[in-house]
UniProtKB/Swiss-Prot annotation:
It comes from Aeromonas hydrophila subsp. hydrophila (strain ATCC 7966 / DSM 30187 / BCRC 13018 / CCUG 14551 / JCM 1027 / KCTC 2358 / NCIMB 9240 / NCTC 8049). GO terms for molecular function: lipid-A-disaccharide synthase activity; phospholipid binding. This is Lipid-A-disaccharide synthase. InterPro entries: Glyco_trans_19. The keyword Glycosyltransferase applies. Keywords: Glycosyltransferase, Lipid A biosynthesis, Lipid biosynthesis, Lipid metabolism, Transferase. The lineage of its organism: Bacteria, Pseudomonadati, Pseudomonadota, Gammaproteobacteria, Aeromonadales.
């Protein structure tokens, strides 16, 4: 009888734990006796993944916190490498967390261990020279999006498009009426979802612009309601402080978390660029993407970022599908103009395109990723 498959796996944050758990579940269906160990969060551990270290060891945010924890993170990496080189797994899977995982993968691959990196870093957008290290470090990159694979193909780097787990999770036709009932909002009003970002700097920069736009929109559409999901209590307090100063009388429904629900309930979405734009596309909502950075950050981004568009719907479509208002173009007046177009025009062609793009990346990513790992294992 062959030995059970041994799989090393590392996730560094909550999103990685969710992603890794989906993959582990599919691999367990193929290899019931498989043994998993590495750096694991609660969802992975609930499936039986042995945690050599807790995921919190890697879950750090911001440069100050990273620098403070760096000695510990480097110690964890040394001990992890020592363990896997002394007890080689049949395959190692690094889930996201590229700053940690790519270095681990490189050393393990040089030691003769097969390696997979799940979730391509945004190497197609900036710091493109990283592709050479990724190519040396991995036997396979599992990519969420088709244009990512196309980028890897240019460098003859092994990559497989597996689809996006978010596209698997979201139904092709979300139930707006049900979500409005759940949120307790008026089903007969028009609603705009306002998402000013998840980080402190984003919320600080984008909220004043979005609030000014909302004030103008209220004059134009007196029946318009606003839903504002904030990722946590801190961002909620930050947003409320800005609102108290700039728009104290503006009536808004504030939610903690529930970004997806807010977008499903809305008719149109106004958001800061990021993953939220992909989510808005998947829930089939016309959107206006706005983004503003500090002047130096923008100057730097112009030189580093190599893509024609900033939002994922436009990158997926390969054309300007939804309006992007970046830097000097991101004004309250321009936001009002673009949002108003969606309220005043028929959006069915746009929604149809969103549905086509949803189907393009809805491939049962967990299963596809497990299949790719199984092919590399060869058993």
């Amino acid at each position: 009888m062959p030995d059970p498959v041994r799989i090393g796996i590392v996730a560094g944050e909550v999103s990685g734990d969710i992603l890794a758990a989906g993959l582990v579940r599919e691999l367990q269906a193929r290899y019931p006796d498989a043994q998993f160990e590495g750096i694991a969060g609660p969802r992975m551990q609930a499936l039986g993944v042995k945690a050599l270290f807790e995921m919190e060891e890697l879950s750090v945010m911001g440069i100050t916190e990273v620098l403070g924890r760096l000695p510990r993170i480097l110690k964890v990496r040394r001990e992890l490498l020592r363990h896997f080189i002394a007890n080689p797994p049949d395959i190692f899977i690094g889930v996201d967390a590229p700053d940690f995982n790519i270095g681990v993968e490189l050393k393990l691959r040089r030691a003769g261990i097969k390696t997979v990196h799940y979730v391509s870093p945004s190497v197609w957008a900036w710091r493109q020279n990283r592709i050479h290290k990724i190519k040396a470090a991995t036997d396979m990159v599992l990519a969420f999006l088709p244009f990512e694979k196309a980028f890897y193909d240019r460098f003859d780097a092994p990559c497989r498009f597996v689809g996006h787990t978010m596209a698997d999770d979201i139904p092709l036709v979300p139930d707006q009426a049900a979500v409005r009932r759940t949120l307790g909002i008026d089903a007969n009003r028009r609603w705009l979802a306002v998402l000013p970002g998840s980080r402190s700097a984003e919320v600080g920069f984008m909220s004043p612009l979005f609030l000014e736009a909302c004030k103008h929109l209220t004059v134009r559409y007196p029946d318009l309601g606003f839903i504002v999901p904030l990722v946590n209590q801190k961002r909620r307090e930050q947003f409320l402080a800005i609102k108290a100063e700039l728009a104290p009388d503006l009536d808004m429904v504030l939610l903690e978390g529930q970004g997806r629900e807010a977008m499903i309930a809305a008719d149109v979405v106004m958001l800061a660029s990021g993953t939220a734009a992909l989510e808005a596309m998947l829930v089939k909502k016309p959107m206006v993407v706005g983004y503003k950075l500090k002047p130096f950050s923008y100057w730097l981004a112009q030189r580093l970022v190599k893509t024609e568009f900033v939002s994922l719907p436009n990158l997926l479509a390969g054309r300007m599908l939804v309006p992007e208002l970046i830097q000097h173009e991101c004004t309250p007046e321009n936001l009002v103009v673009e949002v108003s177009k969606f309220f005043e025009h028929d959006n069915s062609a746009l929604v149809n395109t969103f549905t086509e793009l949803h189907q393009l990346i809805r491939c049962n990513a967990d299963q596809q990723a497990a299949e790719a790992v199984a092919e590399l294992l060869g058993r």
